Amino acid sequence: MEKENVFQKLMGFLNKAGTAIMMNLLFLVSCLPIVTIGAAWSGLYGAVRYTIRGDSWFAGFKYGFKCHFFRNLIGWIFGALVGGYALSRVYIGVMNIMADPAIMSAGVVIPLVISGVFALAAMLVIAVMLPLGMYFPQLDVNTWLVTTWDIIFHAPLQCLVVVALMWFPLALLIFEGLLYVYTFGLVFLAVYFVLVTFIATILLKKSLLRILKLYPREEEE
């Protein structure tokens, strides 16, 4: 009897691990065109939601990707442009200061801080906006943006944790000395983003439930 229980638990674990890997592979493939990263995140959140409630994860991914493609496409591109430009300014500024500390002045530090604020804001918005678009497709654009910032202000620490986890692979690619990215990258990413999505769902659950009371979710097809 004990052996059967152990075997069942092992098979259950392997099944969940296999599902997580398949979800991640589909997510990574969907991200290849770059502009579809927003829709792919929405699809991954849909897959996680469907899995939690016992439905087909593929159906959830398809629903999230298809139904929120254009909205998350716009949100992702805008956030990526703002955040990417701001991060590049921060990177250039920090490199210049490290090369010559004597150049530090208000004219250098203030733009650096402003760029950092814009970069953080863009990363926060992307991290919260994409799951919000999946959970509440009926929100119009203005309400969507306002609600995104509402979540950020009501749960700042949770949102920062989600941002840190979401952008961690990018940091590894930039500072590849922290990990042999090219050797273990695919194995690392094979389960990473699903874990991030589960964690983000848990951390933002209270905020999402609070918003659900204000904007009841439409039935999914």
Question: Which stretches of residues belong to each language-model region?
Answer:
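Cyclin-like alpha-helical protein-protein interaction core
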Residues: 114-118
